[in-house]
Amino acid sequence: MARPKIALIGAGQIGGTLAHLAALKELGDVVLFDIAEGVPQGKALDIAESGPSEKFDADMSGTNDYADIAGADVCIVTAGVARKPGMSRDDLLGINLKVMKSVGEGIRDNAPDAFVICITNPLDAMVWALREFSGLPHHKVCGMAGVLDSARFRHFLADEFNVSMKDVTAFVLGGHGDTMVPLTRYSTVAGIPLPDLIEMGWTTQEKMDAIVQRTRDGGAEIVGLLKTGSAFYAPATSAIEMAEAYLKDQKRVLPCAAYVDGALGLKGMYVGVPTVIGAGGVERVVDINMTKDEQAMFDNSVAAVNGLVEACKAIDETLS
């Protein structure tokens, strides 16, 4: 039986890391695509030459031709411009929208049956645009944001409580930006909700508020430290977690930017929500209950995403 085929659109820092992780996990054969001649080919060869030491069996190739992604089971899109210090994700809108058009058409023409995971920022608007340009079914196109934001939240919580990250669960919903909503009520340590841990004296509300804010600023913190790029290890790991859930039909409950039509009071839009990912793609949205305050924060985040979508329509009239 043929191995799954994984197409990685964009051979930058995230793309290269994705290729390495996919090979290490033996998720399938990898095609690394980029418009820069030599870059995907060089990275693919470098990773392939690590195979004998890492002991993985996976074909690794690089290309500048969309025809080579034909028949891909999974496409992960990282193509576009990354943030620099002082920039917000939203500042990338105009540049990366054009990239999504060419990528969407490339996937539509060559890998129309693929499960597509978008990482390009501003995430929620870009995954919406990518779906529009590609014409793929909504349940086969989603964005990687909530898994990453939740991982950052979990890391900060484990550090605060001095416990294993394996015992920390967390959910971050809403848009992938300053308005994201880390839900402390649905986040736990060994099943104990964070509000209970505050009552137990494990931490204070002030410290928890600071952790929530640091989670929102997680990407900007790394951009500020690197100065010449943005995060790539954690984003790549998060996208691989989603791809693995699809390829292995794991039915994982993961927060991601998915198409919502009816759940959570939303009608026909992409935004970060809890989902179940399996062989059917985004198989369902988990319609959680929110308090009045949580709903207000979520609504604010939804409004911010809608604003970016409207901006996309103003830039490219074919999206209207």
UniProtKB/Swiss-Prot annotation:
Known EC number: 1.1.1.37
First-tier enzyme category under EC: oxidoreductase
Keyword Transmembrane: no
Active site as annotated: 176
Signal sequence residues: none
Protein keywords: NAD, Oxidoreductase, Tricarboxylic acid cycle
Annotated NAD(+) binding sites: 10-15, 34, 96, 119-121
Chemical reaction(s) catalysed: (S)-malate + NAD(+) = oxaloacetate + NADH + H(+)
GO MF term list: L-lactate dehydrogenase activity; L-malate dehydrogenase (NAD+) activity
GO biological process entries: lactate metabolic process; tricarboxylic acid cycle
Residues bound to substrate: 83, 89, 121, 152
InterPro entries, A to Z: L-lactate/malate_DH, Lactate/malate_DH_C, Lactate/malate_DH_N, Lactate_DH/Glyco_Ohase_4_C, Malate_DH_type3, NAD(P)-bd_dom_sf
Pfam families associated with the record: Ldh_1_C, Ldh_1_N
Family stated for the protein in its record: Belongs to the LDH/MDH superfamily. MDH type 3 family.
PANTHER family in the cross-refs: L-2-HYDROXYCARBOXYLATE DEHYDROGENASE (NAD(P)(+)), L-LACTATE DEHYDROGENASE
Protein task: Catalyzes the reversible oxidation of malate to oxaloacetate.
Name the UniProt record assigns to this protein: Malate dehydrogenase
Gene name, Swiss-Prot/TrEMBL: mdh
